[in-house]
């Protein structure tokens, strides 16, 4: 499966557009990570506890998007993007989305 943020894939022709595919995940930091991350935020800089939650959510959302694309018979996803929104205090929604296509050489 080819996944790109671009709208075309060099060396391939798009033979069919299958529609939008997406994967969505809502993740909470959890009490321990939330407390440690909250304390670290006072000092500033990168907060590894929150970074871990965000990266895990992106991977999970990507995997769900990929499964959706395979389910509808795509062999590529173009225009792939991530979006995230704070869902509630301590919870974040991560959305991975793109256009599922069939490519041919």
Labelled PLM ranges:
Residues 21, 26, 34-81:
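Short, well-ordered alpha-helical segments
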Residues 87-91:
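Short glycine-biased active-site loop of nucleotidyltransferases that positions the nucleotide triphosphate
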Residues 6-9, 82-86:
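Short, solvent-exposed loop/turn elements at beta->coil junctions and helix N-caps
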Residues 1-33, 71, 75, 92-105:
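N-terminal presequence-like segments and the immediate start of the first folded domain
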């Amino acid at each position: 499966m080819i996944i790109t943020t671009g709208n075309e894939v060099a060396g391939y022709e798009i033979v069919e557009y299958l529609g939008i595919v997406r994967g969505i995940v809502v993740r909470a930091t959890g009490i321990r990570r939330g407390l440690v991350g909250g304390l670290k935020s006072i000092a500033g800089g990168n907060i590894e506890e929150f970074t871990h939650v965000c990266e895990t959510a992106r991977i999970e959302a990507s995997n769900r998007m990929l499964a959706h694309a395979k389910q509808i018979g795509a062999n590529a996803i173009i225009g792939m993007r991530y979006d995230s929104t704070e869902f509630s205090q301590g919870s974040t929604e991560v959305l991975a989305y793109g256009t599922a296509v069939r490519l041919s050489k």
